[in-house]
Amino acid sequence: MSKFIEPSNEEIKLEKLYQDMGLSDKEYDKVVEILGREPNFTEVGIFSVMWSEHCSYKHSKPFLKQFPTTGEHVLMGPGEGAGVVDIGDNQAVVFKVESHNHPSAIEPYQGAATGVGGIIRDIVSIGARPINLLNSLRFGELTVKQNQRLLKGVVSGIGGYGNCIGIPTTAGEIEFDERYDGNPLVNAMCVGIIDHDMVQKGTAKGVGNSVIYVGLKTGRDGIHGATFASEELTEESESKRPSVQIGDPFVGKKLMEATLEAITFDELVGIQDMGAAGLTSSSSEMAAKGGSGLHLRLDQVPTREPGISPYEMMLSETQERMLLVVEKGTEQKFLDLFNKHELDSAVIGEVTDTDRFVLTYDDEVYADIPVQPLADEAPVYILEGEEKEYNTSKNDYSNIDVHDTFIKLLQHPTIASKHHLYEQYDQQVGANTIIKPGLQASVVRVEGTQKAIASTIDGEARYVFNQPYEGGKMVVAEAYRNLIAVGATPLAMTDCLNYGSPEKKEIYQQLIDSTKGMSEACKVLQTPVVSGNVSLYNETRGTSIFPTPVVGMVGLIEDVSYLKEFKPKAGDKIYLVGETRDDFGGSQLEKLLYGSVNHEFESIDLSDEVSKGKLIKQAIRNGIASHVQTVGKGGLLVTLAKISAHYDLGMQAQLDVTNAQLFSETQGRYIVVVKEGQTLDIDQAQEIGHLTHQQLFDISNSDVKIKENVSDIKQKWEGAIVQCLTTQD
């Protein structure tokens, strides 16, 4: 008789308890078909997390298959803990982005902290040493107190974990819109460096080889976290705080160092982080990839308290844990290593030739499941989409109050400086950060070399909402431009697809069209997708977030020497590269003046992005440019103001655009600051002004003149978020 009191197989079926775990009737029937019998409580739990949206991608898998995943530099693409891309000299960059949206909505500090911890372990499980962190965040408007609380908690959680573990946070983006009220997005990205011959895989093979557990003892925190992440947020979500894991960065640091030492042992067969779905996903996925069976003895699993059942052990998402497969007879070598690092560890099972996933506790069988169907036969749903109807009436932008609009945009939290938030992150730990958070992509030196890795993370949610296909192209191109702007060669990307419920036709269509656009951009820009994540059901009280695909992209700088002089000075000339058109659909201007976004915009020219990017990168590397900035949210006038305020330099410029076009967000444009005495020889480049010692921001077109003290602009731009966070309801 079992020592654990659980519902019987019959009770599970009759009372449909499997529905509470996230399985539909059809999915339960498929489990019965696979097993040839009714599943027990532990088996239902295992199938429910492995077949959850978060783990199986059952609504998004068809779209992921269209992404290009191979390329000249790709060493390892999707399917492992992170992507691996060659950077020369037998070295590679390892990177991935993951979401932790639902947990952060319920418990913002721990939700964000464990998101950072989890993505770090993904990189470490490949065998790479992390060199920097990035994040992409979305919140509701800061006029709402709850959104202020969420922002403060998330930023504190990111800083609290990253700072303690000793990895700099070097770049990111934060946007605010009421569509994220109660449903923030927290996407964390990590980048690491590895030698080619040290790359590890999450595989279990070699009959008789041992399975080793290492890290924090298993508790009851995070049970059904993967299922929770696959549901819409409701009034009842607050009761699911136990589904939010608790992070311990100090143990995380020990685990990271121990893992990086363990990968040097020839006897290591495979390794995987215990992330979403905990011990269930790590062990079953390793068995599936190795074409093997596994027998886990759960009475050997280190636990935080007595009485934890097999069901709870398998579904717990206790943080800071790794699972290893090592050669038989070498177990003590690994256990001694982990003991040296003051980590709990134990041999909990072995690889078998049965092709079955068997769990026992005190020799009693609690699960006996065929490996391949569990890992590979989750149902895939192809649904019907429905095109969104656009507002065909034209918005009127002919009578804009330029000065008032300029100040309002500059102070909107989406555009305003994030300095107050970034200063809570350690940006320099490790002493290899060359370009810190601010205006550009980050640049981190590869230690011991002249090389550096540039990285950026970007999203364009309003544009994807307006025109999903074009918006999908746009978000990839934006990341590409941000790497070009620091002189890097874009190599590859990772993505995080954040959407509402795919069961709603309009949202499913957004998923179809935006991923198609992203795929096309990846092919033209030659930035294959090597890793990623999908987060669906981002809805609160029936209201969906904007469709928010986020792109993390890395680029290579072979020699960082030019960056020593990559800083603008008074006397430098300012060029605008690219044409400015009447592009207002999806823009900050449309949102500011009309309260919503629902107008189409012009398509993006990807071939032009490539040719223009090559010329600008060449100008940077040849020492002609002292700063390059992509023209982004808020348009040309706002972009110029941000450069002036960031560098405390005066600026004088004459712009050949209309009043409304000062705020147009036409894609594919750059501001290139050229060193005094140099010229920019690019067809689409137009000299528009210069930087000055005078602390005046003096910009005009044929109709209006904006003349402000740089200090006033800086105060408005840098002080806006602080003011929002100190404003009481």
Curated annotation (Swiss-Prot):
Gene3D superfamilies, per database record: PurM-like C-terminal domain, PurM-like, N-terminal domain
Binding site for substrate: S99, H100, N101, H102, R121, Q245, E317, T318, Q319, S535
Listed GO biological process terms: 'de novo' IMP biosynthetic process
Entry's EC annotation: 6.3.5.3
Pfam families: AIRS, AIRS_C, FGAR-AT_linker
Chemical reaction(s) catalysed: N(2)-formyl-N(1)-(5-phospho-beta-D-ribosyl)glycinamide + L-glutamine + ATP + H2O = 2-formamido-N(1)-(5-O-phospho-beta-D-ribosyl)acetamidine + L-glutamate + ADP + phosphate + H(+)
Record-linked InterPro entries: PRibForGlyAmidine_synth_PurL, PurL_linker, PurM-like_C_dom, PurM-like_C_sf, PurM-like_N, PurM-like_N_sf
Family stated for the protein in its record: Belongs to the FGAMS family.
Family matches, as HAMAP family: PurL_2
Protein name: Phosphoribosylformylglycinamidine synthase subunit PurL
